[in-house]
């Protein structure tokens, strides 16, 4: 990305990270230089902590300009939904704009019609921009964007342009996706360098969620690379069971407990509220957890690191494009953000690793950013390696 996007991502992620399309870098024509966003009604001092902004507010006219349509799971999931909504709240609060969140009916069993109804309610409720989280929004968002052409849509975790049936790109939609394989790699590399060799991965979406698949494949690659360097063998349980709805469950906690009881030392909990089940199992079995999407160390003492992506920062940038009048330059496309944009990484403000240091981490992150370390994102190649034995749990 260019200067402004890199700047806003750096500013937001600096709170937890040390600063150091179909391609990884969007085409120049879809990613022009961007001026600073000029807020309509700026506050005297920028708010940087989303927890300082209420989840709900009441607008004077009953209209809400910036809307957020949640993914499955809870709004305050301390992960994907919350990280995305944080961006909505911060942009709105810092620019004097009204905002509201909409949760599709039927919770984890929400249908495409439920998601569309939430977007329709947002559009009819005055939304100028609708931020939708999660790849499962695709069908509903395509329908809503085609109907409400004056509304801008920001589709988080979308790795291609949104098109109509005839292949025409919807110009009022921007897709944002991340190179989760990079932060997954960093997490896998870190835990093996820390001395762990019995690992686990449990992912959401039943194996159909591209972001979770990239996280998991990166985790395997990083662990394998560290093991090869150290001359050790790593074993990893790898499962999509009990994660289709990204929810906590007794079944998931039981499975994770069984892994820990049988020698697993660290589990990467990759799927919203699934974290709660894995963290509970870890706490009961003296195990460790890798968090996902945001820094989850405050949620459990079992967390040793988290594979993070810049959800809040990217949403703020995209909203800024709507309000500075330049959204049309990127509408109908998607952007892919990674290390080069300071958009993925591990949290250093809460660093607890002792054998692999922040300096080590920054050096590896810099290699990813300059392209000298390339992490594969083709998760169809997931398999065991000479240094890592993969146990696919079905």
Regions found by a protein language model. Name each.
Residues 1-9:
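Positively charged n-region of N-terminal signal peptides that target proteins for export
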Residues 16-19:
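C-terminal motif of bacterial Sec signal peptides marking the signal peptidase cleavage site
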Residues 22, 31-394:
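A residue-level marker of the well-folded mature domains of exported/periplasmic proteins
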